[in-house]
């Protein structure tokens, strides 16, 4: 669920933003609001899923089941989106925030094309960030299926 919601931002929302404004200041404002809502909900979902994986891992470890490490790995893969955001995406985020702040003060010297290029780069960094919860989900699913089949 987290991955699908996250991917929809890059593949649906960002193109809609591109197609509905021709003012760089408006595009920056829309991106800022998108980021605001995304940063509230997406990490919370990721932390919740990570917590569930770690809870399952702890339960399996307590019952001496070897599969616990796979659930822990699923949790670790899922939460890796947080350091990725802080390390890899922060420079792009900060550039967009600076441009957005500049646009709030008055007319900006940045062109629509420049803003679109930065947001396009951000959208692809965001797609890469989606890989972490997806991998976590796949590891968790495969672990569950293997355990359910009695292996």
State what each model feature region is.
Residues 1-11, 78-91:
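Hydrophobic alpha-helical membrane-embedded segments
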Residues 43-54, 74, 132-137:
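Core segments of transmembrane alpha-helices
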Residues 57-62, 145-146:
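Structural signal for the C-terminal ends of transmembrane alpha-helices
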Residues 1, 62-80:
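Interfacial segments of alpha-helical transmembrane regions
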Residues 94:
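Conserved, charged catalytic cores of large soluble enzymes
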Residues 1-49, 97-119:
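Interfacial loop at the N-terminal end of multi-pass membrane proteins
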Residues 126-150:
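A hydrophobic membrane-anchoring alpha-helix module
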């Amino acid at each position: 669920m987290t991955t699908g919601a996250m991917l929809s931002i890059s593949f649906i929302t960002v193109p809609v933003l591109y197609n509905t404004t021709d003012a760089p200041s408006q595009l920056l404002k829309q991106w800022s609001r998108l980021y605001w809502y995304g940063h509230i909900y997406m990490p919370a979902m990721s932390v919740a899923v990570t917590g569930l994986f770690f809870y399952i891992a702890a339960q399996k470890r307590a019952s001496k089941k070897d599969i616990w490490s796979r659930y822990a790995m699923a949790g670790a893969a899922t939460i890796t989106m947080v350091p990725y955001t802080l390390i890899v995406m922060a420079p792009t985020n900060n550039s967009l925030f600076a441009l957005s702040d500049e646009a709030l003060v008055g007319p900006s010297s940045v062109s629509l094309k420049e803003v679109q290029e930065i947001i396009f780069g951000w959208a692809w960094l965001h797609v890469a960030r989606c890989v972490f919860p997806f991998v976590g989900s796949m590891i968790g699913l495969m672990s569950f299926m293997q355990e359910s089949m009695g292996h």
